[in-house]
Amino acid sequence: MTNEKCRVLVHEDLGSGYRRIVFDAPAIAAASAPGQFVHVRVPGLEMSALRRPFSIFNAEDGKLELLYKRVGRGTAVLNELAVGAEASVLGPLGHGFPEACDGVPLLVGGGYGVAPFYFLSRRLMAAGHKPVLFVGGRTSTDLLALDRFASLDVEVRTATNDGSAGTKGLVTDPLDKMLAELRTRGERFELFACGPDPMLKAVAMRATGTGAKGWISMDRHMVCGVGACYACIQKTVRGNSRCCIEGPVFAAEDLVW
């Protein structure tokens, strides 16, 4: 874990309130793994003891890339951070996704829950795997970074509630179709998920119900980010766990819903 003063290299609008920011962060980028997160303190909030947590979208060549949505005071201030400005970034933090996979990696993201899967896809592909990404949202503008996954040649299947892109319905609809295809062919698979709780529970149930491994990134309100305050508790079969230390990624079989 490093507290690094990082300069903004890129900060751009993705539409519908979503943004992409890239920091020059050589120490953090070198130590980061898929599924981990960073805590950012932005100019204008220096009087606050609290940082804001963000999933790592990518870490490569000394650069740290994040996706976020403007939803509160912290992200509103971050939204105004110009190229060339600096912010204090603490990380990498948390327990991420495993990068070894027994079978076909099926990545399931809801909205900006897709954030950790670009980095994970890169690592899985480097290990010889061919991940399949399932992305869901209310409408087509909630499907983020599809061009980036296309640049990796990742197979992407989409779903939207309003039918404006991909399958009309839930992201678990195309997922279920893929699971049926894999079972018919006798192929093994592992599930990886990040997004809203109902989706996470649905994916976890599919993992435990089929005997497959499942890895679930839980989204909980974080305060300190380093395990001291116990604000980000997740119930597991072993008792209460901290999302910032034991998580945010947990084995599906360990979660209590």
Please name every model-derived segment:
Residues 197-198, 219-248:
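Local cysteine-cluster metal-coordination motifs and their immediate loop/turn environment
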Residues 2-83:
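Ferredoxin-reductase
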Residues 45-54, 94-101, 244:
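Short, Lys/Arg- and Gly-enriched loop/turn segments at beta-strand edges
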Residues 10, 58, 158-160, 216, ...:
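Structural signal for conserved beta-strand scaffold positions within catalytic alpha/beta enzyme cores
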Residues 73-216:
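FNR/FR-type flavoprotein reductase catalytic core
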Residues 245-257:
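Short microdomains enriched in Cys/His and/or Lys/Arg
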